[in-house]
């Protein structure tokens, strides 16, 4: 486990304030199970020992954040770097409102690619750049899930290499995306503002 790694996450909505504790305990139990799996030896069967060091204050703080009945994404993060065989690990938690982060067709990143004057490796690096920029924006916005690329990336690369002039390449949100994620990205190639093809 590395510092800041998400151990568990869940979308929660608590209608009755007294149900908040059960919801938080369930997410912490999932985090404990996941930590046991991640920190057990490769051939060993993961145990379900209490590896996550949880305090009553941490539980109270999370309950206070989510008990208003709105939708929240609750995330449990590793507070440090841990290796196999650790007996206890520290964590920190975050509860963020599940709200619209990116609208469908919103531009996330832009670059240019010119297969006439660039090697195929340079073209691929440009595409990876817009994907990385999209992932960065998603993480900064609090989206937990990994970015998913719509369609076939390799087909897009092949089509791009057949165009023998500079085109604009954009990463756009394929659909409305909320904090819970995932962010689905569509990669689009444009020439003079007109879409040529996309993933």
Predicted regions and their residues:
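Membrane-proximal structural modules of membrane-associated proteins and complexes
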Residues: 1-199
């Amino acid at each position: 486990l590395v510092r800041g790694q998400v151990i568990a996450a869940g979308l929660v909505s608590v209608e009755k304030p007294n149900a908040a504790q059960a919801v938080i305990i369930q997410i912490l139990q999932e985090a404990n199970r996941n930590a046991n799996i991640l920190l057990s030896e490769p051939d060993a069967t993961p145990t379900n020992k209490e590896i996550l060091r949880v305090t009553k204050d941490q539980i109270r703080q999370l309950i206070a954040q989510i008990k208003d009945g709105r939708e929240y994404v609750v995330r449990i993060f590793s507070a440090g770097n841990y290796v196999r065989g650790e007996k206890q690990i520290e964590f920190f938690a975050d509860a963020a409102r599940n709200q619209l982060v990116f609208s469908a067709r919103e531009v996330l990143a832009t670059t240019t690619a010119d297969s006439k004057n660039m090697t195929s490796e340079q073209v691929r690096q440009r595409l990876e750049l817009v994907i990385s920029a999209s992932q960065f924006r998603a993480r900064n916005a609090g989206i937990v899930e990994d970015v998913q690329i719509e369609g076939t990336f390799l087909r897009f690369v092949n089509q791009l290499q057949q165009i023998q002039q500079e085109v604009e390449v954009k990463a756009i949100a394929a659909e409305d995306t909320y904090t819970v994620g995932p962010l689905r990205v569509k990669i689009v190639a444009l020439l003079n503002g007109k879409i040529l093809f996309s993933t």
